């Protein structure tokens, strides 16, 4: 969609995350019976993915599943959870560490109803941020249950961006891209941090310095 093609060769097995049990290993890191998790490394894109009964994968792509969580629980997070965690901590902690404690209070999350967005809303809320959730779906109660303080329609941001607008946010997690990201950049306060991780709307970013 929108020119952002990930899979280039077919036939192909998708599935960017998987969790399971090792049945055969040529690696010293893992042995038969080990429970593992795979996330990232472009598995499901340039390598065959996890939508299969068995998967052959580079051992460097794997980690042992921590005790205390099930494979199902691990996959509830997966790539979406890992991405959300990285974005949330980057948005909040980078500013507070690099700028000697300058706090991140007001944050906007786009695509807030999606996998990455919903987890980012939860994390940022737990970190004490005032979270604005931008979404195309009529699910205000759901987003508020995750910790969102304010809900806006994504359409309010999906338009040609002005060169500069009113500073509203100390930080942002954008999962959408395109005009929405361009508009967010104009609304970020001085020294703000934006973590952009998606291009569902567009791979083009029309902005200005």
Language-model segments: which ranges?
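Glycine-rich beta-strand-centered segment in the early N-terminal region that forms part
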Residues: 2-43
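Short amphipathic alpha-helix with an adjacent loop that forms part of the alpha/beta core around
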Residues: 157-167
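Hydrophobic beta-strand signal
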Residues: 19, 37-38, 56, 108, ...
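Residue-level marker of beta-strand positions
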Residues: 34-36, 54, 126, 130, ...
């Amino acid at each position: 969609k929108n020119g952002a093609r990930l899979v280039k060769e077919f036939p192909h097995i998708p599935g960017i995350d998987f969790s399971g049990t090792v049945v055969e290993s040529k690696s010293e890191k893992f042995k038969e019976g080990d429970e593992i998790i795979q996330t990232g490394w472009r598995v499901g894109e340039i390598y065959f993915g996890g939508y299969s009964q068995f998967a052959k994968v580079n051992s460097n792509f794997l980690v042992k599943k921590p005790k205390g969580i099930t494979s199902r629980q691990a996959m509830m997070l997966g790539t979406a959870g890992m991405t959300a965690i990285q974005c949330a901590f980057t948005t909040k902690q980078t500013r507070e560490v690099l700028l000697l404690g300058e706090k991140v209070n007001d944050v906007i999350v786009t695509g807030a109803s999606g996998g990455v967005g919903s987890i980012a809303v939860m994390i940022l809320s737990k970190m004490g941020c005032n979270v604005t959730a931008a979404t195309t779906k009529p699910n205000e109660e759901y987003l508020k249950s995750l910790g969102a303080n304010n809900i806006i329609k994504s359409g309010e941001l999906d338009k040609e961006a002005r060169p500069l607008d009113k500073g509203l946010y100390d930080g942002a997690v954008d999962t959408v891209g395109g005009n929405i990201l361009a508009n967010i950049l104009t609304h970020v306060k001085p020294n703000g941090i934006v973590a952009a991780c998606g291009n569902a709307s567009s791979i083009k970013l029309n902005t200005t310095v």
